[in-house]
């Protein structure tokens, strides 16, 4: 996609103005877990009611969400424009788009949709996979290969001011240390519009070192998606839980707040349930957790919310 010098300059200006790391700036009026900072996630293919664009946007507005991260499947592609129009009608900001893993025709189509609807600064969430590397040479080659792949997406996204967010989804790519190596290599190439979106539901094996990982990710962190977290939940049928029902939820929220990071907070459905019902449940759980953040009792002594 060739946007020309003028469009590219405009996109670069948008990137500078609303770049991915601006949210780390101090702001005395900022409230990390306020409704205005929340993002609805995993509610398009994950929705028992199979809402269309208008129903979905109306539901988000009714629940008080002002931001949305768009995930999709092949059947949703014909409705891309309708989705953008519905979001605009209901005053919902498109924060992020679940993006193809390489720069293919579908990726070009998405950037064209963003351009057509004058949407700048939309995060592109890109996942990866891969087994563990076996030695230093293997690691170096893997980092270079993944950096090449991400660069193919990041450079065409820059004219629209869109940052690419590396999305942890398990495997080698889902380890923050590896993502940070990819980002460092890209920065050495002059590619600076790449950050991280961290998903708790894909981080069960990382919770014990979460504060350490959070500190390292913080300069590059674009968003955090919350989830009800219990030890080993991914191995015991509790991969996805409503907020407040996980034993680790309060401790993790305290870690996030204590880090000083500022940025969007995602609430997800990611189940076959009605998206509205699960979002309501997460909103309720988050509200009750926030009320306990300053409770002097250790998180381990505060009982999780009962399940439905």
Which residues does each PLM region occupy?
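Catalytic domains of carbohydrate-active enzymes, especially glycoside hydrolases
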Residues: 53-76, 95
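Histidine-acidic metal/acid-base catalytic patches
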Residues: 26-39, 51-58, 148-155, 176-308
């Amino acid at each position: 996609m060739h946007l020309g010098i003028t469009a590219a300059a405009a996109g670069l200006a948008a990137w500078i103005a609303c770049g991915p790391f601006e949210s780390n700036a101090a702001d005395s009026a900022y409230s990390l877990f306020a409704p205005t900072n929340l993002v609805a996630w995993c509610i398009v293919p994950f929705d028992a009611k199979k809402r269309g664009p208008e129903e979905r946007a109306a539901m988000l507005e009714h629940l008080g969400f002002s931001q949305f991260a768009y995930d999709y499947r092949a059947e949703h592609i014909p409705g891309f424009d309708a989705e953008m129009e519905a979001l605009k009608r209901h005053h919902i900001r498109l924060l992020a788009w679940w993006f193809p893993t390489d720069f293919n025709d579908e990726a070009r189509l998405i950037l064209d949709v963003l351009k057509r609807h004058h949407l700048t600064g939309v995060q592109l969430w890109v996942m990866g996979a891969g087994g563990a590397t076996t030695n230093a040479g293997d690691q170096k080659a893997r980092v270079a290969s993944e950096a090449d792949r991400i660069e193919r997406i990041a450079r065409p996204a820059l004219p629209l001011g869109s940052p690419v967010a590396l999305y942890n989804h398990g495997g080698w790519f889902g380890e923050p240390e590896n993502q940070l190596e990819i980002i460092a290599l890209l920065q050495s190439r002059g590619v600076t519009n790449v950050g991280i979106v961290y998903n708790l539901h894909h981080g069960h094996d990382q919770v014990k070192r979460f504060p350490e990982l959070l500190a390292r990710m913080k300069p590059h962190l674009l968003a955090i998606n919350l989830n009800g977290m219990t030890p080993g939940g991914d191995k015991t049928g509790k991969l996805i839980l409503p907020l407040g029902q996980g034993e680790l939820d309060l401790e993790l929220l305290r870690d996030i707040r204590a880090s000083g990071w500022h940025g969007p907070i995602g609430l997800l459905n990611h189940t076959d349930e009605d998206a509205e019902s699960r979002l309501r449940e997460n909103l309720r759980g988050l509200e009750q957790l926030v009320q306990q953040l300053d409770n002097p009792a250790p998180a381990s002594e505060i009982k999780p919310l009962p399940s439905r």
